[in-house]
């Protein structure tokens, strides 16, 4: 980002913040719901992960969930969901891990090490979940929570590399957090008194457009570049109309 523009003046005040971006402050983004699912799937898909040379398996997580008072059936459903895209189960699992307490000092050293690692991972989930889902937080508190999550993820990845999460996933989650700060700064510059909701970021708007395109064209799914551009333009107009008149939609 070139020095001297308003966006640089705003974001350069943040120590260690990554100011690399495209033309005119363009940044990539990843949908927060998909990022959360990937945290869940990364933990479960590999059957184990390692932080600070402490191996965490699904059985260890199951034991910790049972210690919270969850039933065996509930713990199994959270760790072995029939639908890998089940958003509610994913939130429940990450929230449960974020609620794990610290171990008693008189426990065995291996148990203390395991609890410490899970408690640390739970802090990551806590900050991410509350930043996006706690409606009582102010924007300043949301940004503070995202910053805390980013610092923890950076430290964990620096120490553990792919034993913690894959490098591509690390890039994606850090890009998601970075984009929130960029979008906030752009809004602050364009309209200092405007309201800003980070939960509206992501790909929901794009997915809504493609769903509308699919509904409009039916089985005629093949298209050249010009046809697709026309379809998307029509879909966007329909979505804008329905946002102004929701009573005209299918649910009315």
Predicted regions and their residues:
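Non-catalytic regulatory appendages
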Residues: 1-252
């Amino acid at each position: 980002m070139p020095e001297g523009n308003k966006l640089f003046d705003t974001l350069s005040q943040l120590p260690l913040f990554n100011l690399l971006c495209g033309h005119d402050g363009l940044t990539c983004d990843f949908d927060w719901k998909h990022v959360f699912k990937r945290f869940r799937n990364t933990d479960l898909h590999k059957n184990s992960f390692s932080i600070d040379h402490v191996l965490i398996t699904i059985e260890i997580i199951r034991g910790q969930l049972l210690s919270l008072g969850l039933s065996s059936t509930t713990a199994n459903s959270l760790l072995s969901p029939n639908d890998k895209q089940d958003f509610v189960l994913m939130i429940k699992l990450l929230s449960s891990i974020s609620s794990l307490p610290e171990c008693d000092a008189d426990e065995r050293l291996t148990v203390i090490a395991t609890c410490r690692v899970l408690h640390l991972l739970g802090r990551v989930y806590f900050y991410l979940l509350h930043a996006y889902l706690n409606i009582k937080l102010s924007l300043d508190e949301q940004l503070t929570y995202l910053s805390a999550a980013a610092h923890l993820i950076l430290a964990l990845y620096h120490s553990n590399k792919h034993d913690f999460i894959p490098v591509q996933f690390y890039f994606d989650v850090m890009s998601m957090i970075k984009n929130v700060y960029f979008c906030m700064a752009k809004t602050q510059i364009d309209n200092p008194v405007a309201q800003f909701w980070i939960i509206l970021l992501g790909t929901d708007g794009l997915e809504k457009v493609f769903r509308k395109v699919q509904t409009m064209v039916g089985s005629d799914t093949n298209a050249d570049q010009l046809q697709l551009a026309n379809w998307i333009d029509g879909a966007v107009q329909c979505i804008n109309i329905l946002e102004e008149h929701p009573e005209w939609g299918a649910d009315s």
